[in-house]
């Protein structure tokens, strides 16, 4: 299933949730380094996205990005937001509330182009569990909810 960012929020099966939790645990155990790696992959393949992060301007190499405290801080926030969604897979109302709030911030305060949510989600899937339909569904849930304020 490809990652989508519109339509109805897909439901996860118990087996998909179990697979996601199992795959996510070692990723989250190294959340700082994994988060930075994901963000660097995202910026490397989508350099225009870096314009939405004023504090990242002038960081032109992967090494500069990796050493930046601002990049590390934001990467940690992304990984923690995904972790919140993983933890809340059994409480979609809680997940929805948190992600809709995050959507409002990204739409109104940061004016992020919402197309990048899906692109970043694909990088996360490729890093955590490439091609897994359940994780793609979870990322679709996140992307749909993050677009809710646009």
From Swiss-Prot:
Name of the molecule in the record:
Globin-1
Q: Identify the stretch annotated as signal peptide in this record.
A: none
What more is known?
This is one of the minor globin component of Sea lamprey.
What species is this protein from?
Petromyzon marinus
**What are the alphabetically sorted keywords of the record?**
Heme, Iron, Metal-binding, Oxygen transport, Transport
The organism's superkingdom is given as Eukaryota
UniProt binding sites for heme b: 74, 106
**What is an example of a GO molecular function annotated in this UniProt entry?**
oxidoreductase activity
Pinpoint the Globin domain residues.
Answer: 11-150
The record's similarity note reads: Belongs to the globin family.
Complex formation:
Monomer.
Gene3D superfamilies xref list: Globins (1.10.490.10)
- InterPro entries noted in UniProt: Globin (IPR000971), Globin-like_sf (IPR009050), Globin/Proto (IPR012292), Globin_lamprey/hagfish (IPR013314)
């Amino acid at each position: 299933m490809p990652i989508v960012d519109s339509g109805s929020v897909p439901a996860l099966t118990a087996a998909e949730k179990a697979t996601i939790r199992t795959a996510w645990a070692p990723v989250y155990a190294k959340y700082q380094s994994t988060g930075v790696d994901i963000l660097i992959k995202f910026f490397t393949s989508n350099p225009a996205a870096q314009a939405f992060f004023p504090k990242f301007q002038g960081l032109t190499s992967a090494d500069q990005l990796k050493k930046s405290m601002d990049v590390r801080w934001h990467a940690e926030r992304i990984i923690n937001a995904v972790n919140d969604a993983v933890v809340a897979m059994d409480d979609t109302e809680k997940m929805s509330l948190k992600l809709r709030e995050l959507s409002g911030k990204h739409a109104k305060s940061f004016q992020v182009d919402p197309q990048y949510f899906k692109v970043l989600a694909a990088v996360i899937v490729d890093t955590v569990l490439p091609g897994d339909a359940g994780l793609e569904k979870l990322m679709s849930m996140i992307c749909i909810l993050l677009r809710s304020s646009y």
